Design a protein with these regions (language model features):
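Strand-connecting loop/turn motifs
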Residues: 3, 21-23, 69-73, 116-120, ...
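Short, conserved structural micro-motifs that define repeat-unit consensus positions
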Residues: 59-65, 158-160, 170-172
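Short glycine/proline- and aromatic-enriched beta-strand/turn motifs that initiate or cap beta-hairpins
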Residues: 20-66, 134, 198-207
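Gram-negative (and chloroplast) outer-membrane scaffold detector with strong preference
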Residues: 56-139, 196-207
Length: 207
């Protein structure tokens, strides 16, 4: 009898409706975006690399838990990530824009492990769009003759960890890779896509 009671209790814990818990999240994350150097085809022999700065980046993210148990929680999230100052460095100042802004919006599914414990790791995967707003000025200071608005598709994969802090708040650290098309930088790198790596940390409000 005790065995049956214990089994029933464990089964009930596994199917507790998510409505019994705080189902919504709103998070604010601050970090940096990292982009690998790209070779410029036909660029100067002494320096043919297109280099990117590590732009200060922030994320606002809304998530809603759809189902879960003591072992896991599955949520739908909408990370919106903005990099307002991605500097560019190249030995072709009369061709390359001085920088650009980027905006990523990628609805995703996120799986948290052990969501009710003090520490909860998670993974996320989704897709949406990326928009690049290229500078109207070139590195040399003259007017950019190229396009100054580029929208592409985007895939997002991420990992992170949530640590309960106080009451309805958690501290979050995360890494996300946004795989997108390219901004219009007026040079040929031989690539059609790039990885935009976002690393950041911030607070999550559970309500």
């Amino acid at each position: 009898m005790k065995g049956l009671t214990l089994a029933a209790f464990l089964a009930a814990c596994a199917i507790v409706p998510s409505a019994m818990a705080q189902r919504n999240e709103l998070s604010g994350i601050l970090g940096r975006t990292f982009i690998s150097d790209q070779g410029i085809q036909g660029g100067p022999a002494f320096d043919s690399q297109l280099r990117f700065g590590n732009g200060l980046t922030f994320e606002v993210n809304y998530a809603r838990r759809m189902m879960g148990s003591a072992a896991f929680a599955l949520s739908v999230e909408v990370p919106f990530v903005v990099n307002l100052d991605e500097d560019i460095h190249a030995a072709l100042p009369s061709k390359v824009p001085e920088g650009y802004k980027s905006f990523f919006a990628t609805p995703a599914a996120r799986l948290n492990l052990f969501p009710a414990t003090a520490v909860s790791p998670w993974v996320s995967f989704g897709g949406g769009f990326a928009h690049f707003s290229e500078s109207s000025n070139l590195l040399f200071g003259t007017t950019n003759p190229g396009k100054t608005g580029t929208t592409t598709g985007a895939l997002q994969g991420g990992v992170g960890i949530d640590i309960k802090a106080f009451k309805s708040f958690s501290v979050r650290g995360e890494f996300r890779d946004f795989w997108t098309g390219l901004p219009q930088l007026n040079v040929d790198t031989g690539k059609s896509h790039q990885h935009n790596y976002f690393v950041g940390g911030g607070l999550v409000w559970h309500f």
